[in-house]
Amino acid sequence: MAGEFRWQAGRPDTAQAGGWALAHCQQRFLQDDNGLLFPREWLKRQDLPLLAEHGVGHWQGEPVYLLELDEPLELPGMAWTPLRQFMLHGDFDQFCMLGYASQIGIWARHNRFCGNCGTRMQALGHERVMQCPQCNLHQYPRLSPSMIVLVTRGDEVLLARSPRFVPGVYSTLAGFVEAGESVEQCVVREVREEVGVEVANLEYIGSQNWPFPHSLMLGFHAEYVSGEIVPQEDEIEDAQWFSLDALPPLPAQRSIARHLIDLYLARRSGAAEPVLPG
C-alpha cells in the first residue's frame, strides 16, 4: 500500500448519508469517464438492481460503499470493467480497494441465506460477518490460502503454463492448501503433482492478496532435488527448465508470480531486489 494511505479498508455505517459508491457485479465494476467512484446518493437514485450495500472503507479519508448489484445493468455513458484489468494497469491503491470490495460483494452474495437452515442471513454492524438469526451460524468473508513457488536449479528455473494462460506465457507453480496440511507441505505436494519433481530448501518470500475471487497467495522459492518433468494431465499444458538469459513471456509485473521470478534474477545477478506489490 502506498505511503499516503489513500485507501484503508473499514466498515462505514450504511445508515449514514453521503460518501462515494462503487457498483459491482460478477467481478466487474461500473465506470465512466471520471472513474469508478460515484457520489453515493446519486448512484442510488439510478434505479439499479441493488442486492446489498456494504461499507468497505475510506478513499482519501472519504467513506466508500459497495453497491452489489443483482445484474450488470447498462447505463448511458458507462461501462462494466473486469477487476483483472485494474490489476494489470493503473493505480495499484485503487486495485487494492476494488479487490477488497469485490471479495466483500461475492461473500455477501453467496451468504444471503443460511447454509444450515435456509433462513435469510443478517449482516452484523460491529464486525464483518453474516449471522443466521435462526440457528446462529456465522459466515465470515472467505479466504483461500494458496502456495505459489518458483522452483530453481542454479541458473535455471522451472516454469509451466496452464491451458487457461495467455498464449505463450509461462509462470510459476501454484495450488491451494488442503485441509490438514501446512503451506510447506502444500508446496512439496503441488510441485510433485503438477510436474513430477521433488524440491527442498523452501524459502518463504512474501504474500499477496489475489481477489480472483478470494485467494491469499503465499510465495516461496524452492530448490530442485530430483525427478524428470511430467506435466499433470488437464492442469499443466507444458513445463520446462528455462535458462535465466532465455526466459519466455512472463506474468504481469504486479503479480507475485512475476515478483518471485524477478527476485531470483536480481539475486543471481547481484542487482537491487524488487519490492513485492501490495
Swiss-Prot record:
Cofactors required: Mg(2+); Mn(2+); Zn(2+)
Reactions catalysed according to its record: a 5'-end NAD(+)-phospho-ribonucleoside in mRNA + H2O = a 5'-end phospho-adenosine-phospho-ribonucleoside in mRNA + beta-nicotinamide D-ribonucleotide + 2 H(+); NAD(+) + H2O = beta-nicotinamide D-ribonucleotide + AMP + 2 H(+); NADH + H2O = reduced beta-nicotinamide D-ribonucleotide + AMP + 2 H(+)
Pfam families: NUDIX, NUDIX-like, Zn_ribbon_NUD
UniProt KW Cell membrane keyword: no
Short sequence motif named Nudix box, residue ranges: 175-196
Cofactor: record remark: Divalent metal cations. Mg(2+) or Mn(2+). Binds 1 zinc ion per subunit.
CDD domains xref list: NUDIX_NADH_pyrophosphatase_Nudt13 (cd03429)
Keyword Zinc (UniProt): yes
Keywords, sorted A to Z: Hydrolase, Magnesium, Manganese, Metal-binding, NAD, Zinc
MF annotations from Gene Ontology: magnesium ion binding; manganese ion binding; NAD+ diphosphatase activity; NADH pyrophosphatase activity; RNA NAD-cap (NMN-forming) hydrolase activity; zinc ion binding
UniProt-annotated binding residues for a divalent metal cation 3: 190, 194, 235
InterPro entries membership: NAD-cap_RNA_hydrolase_NudC, NADH_PPase-like_N, NudC-like_C, NUDIX_hydrolase-like_dom_sf, NUDIX_hydrolase_CS, NUDIX_hydrolase_dom, RNA_Hydrolase_NudC, Znr_NADH_PPase
Domain of life: Bacteria
Gene Ontology, cellular component aspect: cytosol
Record GO biological process: NAD catabolic process; NADH metabolic process; NADP catabolic process
Family: Belongs to the Nudix hydrolase family. NudC subfamily.
Quaternary structure and interacting proteins, as annotated: Homodimer.
Stated name of the protein: NAD-capped RNA hydrolase NudC
Protein source organism: Pseudomonas paraeruginosa (strain DSM 24068 / PA7) (Pseudomonas aeruginosa (strain PA7))
Gene: nudC
